[in-house]
Amino acid sequence: MWSPNIKFRNEDITNLLGTKVVKLGAAMVPEGRRVFKHLSVDENIRVGSITRQDGSQSIRGDHRKMYDHFPILKNVAHRLAGYCSGGEQQMIAIARALMASPKMLMLDEPSLGLAPLLVREIFEKVSNINQEMDTTILVVEQNAKIALEVSSYAYIMESGKIVLEGKSDELRNNPDVKEFYMGITQGGGRKSFKEVKSYKRRKRWM
């Protein structure tokens, strides 16, 4: 029986406690944001640094950076996180994870439940963080269009299996990916997922 392992920075983290994984440099923003609703926005952000041991000066510097990346949170810093909008809560969750000073930030469905304009704003901020903080970012996302726009490399999964992978710009221009995952036909028009014949879908990944 095959037993999968998860390795990060050459260390097996399969059975490690979450706190130890964070100390190794991996942080995660779970699906649905999951902020501490009874804490203020600022308290939520600060709690992300609880595993750090690099000194208060460095932590204070990163704390200031979070408000530079997400200036809208400055205006609600003392508000209970539970009373914030979905977009604000997503920003809080990302800022909280970044306060752990991760080498890799993992985002699970960051667009879930957000309006299209907010989705684009969140992904633009994530892209900026990737460039400015030199942080590797791994995103699990069903919105293929925007995910392929901001990423450098992508994997397409179906039923838990990787069926296609490659550079994002190449996948973005792949006719099959455009038609099925982005609803764009070869003629440039948009196409509903319901209009894509299932036999074509099966044939592509065989």
Task: Give names to the regions the model predicted.
Residues 153, 165:
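Short, glycine/charged-rich "phosphate-handling" switch motifs in NTP-dependent
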Residues 80-84, 88:
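Conserved ABC ATPase signature
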Residues 99-103:
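A short, proline-enriched helix->beta-strand linker immediately N-terminal to the Walker B motif
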Residues 184-206:
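ABC ATPase nucleotide-binding domains
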